[in-house]
Amino acid sequence: MPRLFLAFLLLLTARVSADKLEPRILFLGDSITYGGNWTVYVESAIRAQKGLSRATIVNMGLSSETTSGLSEPGHAGGSFPRPDLHERLGRVLAQFKPTLVVACYGINDGIYQPLDAVRQLAFQDGIIRLRLACIRSGAQVILVTPPLYAPDNRSKDVINYDGVMEAYGAWLVAQRSAGWQVIDIHPHLHQAVDAAKKADPAFVYAKDNLHPGEQGHLFMAQAVWQSLAPMMKWKADVSFAEGAKLKLLRDSSIVLRDAWLMQAGHKRPGVKGGLPLAQAEARSDDFIAEYLKK
């Protein structure tokens, strides 16, 4: 059977399966996703949809992670190599059983080096493996292009690592012609940061050039949501949660994230352990119940 036809059948099966099951939405990514701010904004928009207010939504991002399996020499002071998503992905999919996976990788996959064909191919292979594993598990998968690198200090990005991320993102976008669902956040983020700096020259997207601040996470969420909503046929014109409501969702997200990372297991040292899964789910249910009252 031709590989393209097989991929089409797998994708069709995943979408039919997802339509029949209760929504179980999984976010995967590196430290920017682990931080959880952009995912919580998106979660609030998902919970505003009819029938999704109590959907199971879990962020299992993991700091330092790649899809490529690459790690630069001396990473983390030589204490450990970057974790490889594929070491844990099978367990995550088997245990959580997502109907939808939203994955954002790339920023670590280039290991902060100039654009290189070998590293780029490793990223592409890792993404292909990620996508196929999700589809084979019965999940719909939506891939998000990498975010920005050093937009506040472009003159210091001497190897043009943001350009590496643009190249990685361009490859992802090109896969739309093969039926992939891809959200391209890179152009939106540049526009949003440029507009913010024009309004306030002191605005900073990422103090360390990598991890966005709160406003940067909001920009990411906006960029994701404007494409995710039509892809999923959700109502796009909804407001993200704010204030006390947003905090309740963050508390719920953190307790589930920590429990699920511990439950599924990983090889990244220094990650805070969580509650036993049943206890975490009960606490999350309490947070969501309070969230829905406000």
Which sequence ranges carry the predicted segments?
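Sec-dependent N-terminal signal peptides
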Residues: 4-13
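Serine-esterase "nucleophile elbow" of acetyl-processing enzymes
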Residues: 17-71, 78-79, 89-97, 101, ...
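Solvent-exposed loop/turn segments at secondary-structure junctions
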Residues: 31-34, 62-68, 100, 106-112, ...
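Extracytoplasmic/secreted envelope proteins and their assembly/folding machinery
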Residues: 39, 43, 86, 90, ...
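Conserved catalytic region of serine esterases and O-acyltransferases that act on ester linkages
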Residues: 51, 178, 198-294
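The substrate-binding groove and active-site-proximal loops of carbohydrate-active enzymes
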Residues: 78-79, 111-122, 155-163, 211
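A short helix->loop->beta-strand "cap" motif at the edges of active sites that frequently abuts
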Residues: 135-140, 180
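Substrate-gating cap/lid alpha-helix
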Residues: 151-186
